[in-house]
Amino acid sequence: MKRAPTKQPAKPAARGGERAQGRVIAAHGRHYIVAPADGGPMLQCFPRGKKSEVAVGDRVAYERTSADQGVIVEIGERRNLLYRSDQFKSKLFAANLDQLLIVLATEPYFSEDLLGRALIAAEANELKPIVVLNKIDVEAALPVARERLAPYRALGYDVLELSVKGAPDDARAQLAPRLAGHSTILLGQSGMGKSTLVNLLVPDAEAATREISAALNSGRHTTTFTRLYPLQDGGALIDSPGFQEFGLYHLTEGRLERAFPEFRPLLAHCRFYNCHHLHEPGCAILEALADGRIAPTRHALYAQLVHEASQIVR
């Protein structure tokens, strides 16, 4: 009499060599953490080939190489990609974003150049910018900070005044509705209170950071990788390491002029269609600068960015 065949155990959904879908939730060098779309445990992935174009927020296809590792073989179509660049290299921030939240503080003194560049990057990528002024409980420094931010309020930018440590409930009440359902990247210089803000909005952020750091084998570098935190009310918060420079060498002159909201209504009124808005006669931008409708600091930033862009061979 023939014996009945033994029943084989069910095979895992994504075996070695089989493609699966996921989302990149952390990046450190060429190491990436991918959260599988099927809800399985996260795994460490590496890009195929020497050059990596993977960013946090990317939807990717990967092939599993072991129980907890894989190779990224394809990057899904992106809505956008935020990055900074100089003459020699680019640094990716994140992909598929809706908003850019810039964290400033009354002290230490924030860089207005970095603020201006972050706003230009947001405009060029069609992201909604939100400016946070933290540490408003430092009352001695508050009037100067407000005065410095007044021109940006006048341009229509959201400027939220918070004290994340001193009044956390108020900070959460202001931010949570603006972040719900959106993918938001958090940018700021070191010392502005960015980490405190993340811990306020993502209660288990420290535990998640330790877990990701262990998976990346980078326990000594817990603040030097970009990571994505899902939010309780939907959406995601992407925290990027603090930085001191924000090069935008990759933006063409045409993209730059349209990234200044105060320039846009005037662009069609220049005498020359290829006006550079630097010293040309009949330039509507320069006329607005002369009569005070455009701030000198903003035009100076535009001129600097155009100069930087001219250094790149396209």
Swiss-Prot record:
Location of the CP-type G domain: 85-246
Q: Which GO terms describe its molecular function?
A: GTP binding; GTPase activity; metal ion binding; rRNA binding
Give the chief site where it resides: cytoplasm
- What GO terms describe the biological role, i.e. biological process, of this protein? ribosomal small subunit biogenesis
Q: Which NCBIfam families match?
A: ribosome small subunit-dependent GTPase A (TIGR00157)
Assembly, per entry? Monomer. Associates with 30S ribosomal subunit, binds 16S rRNA.
Q: What is this protein called?
A: Small ribosomal subunit biogenesis GTPase RsgA
Q: Which organism is it from?
A: Burkholderia pseudomallei (strain 668)
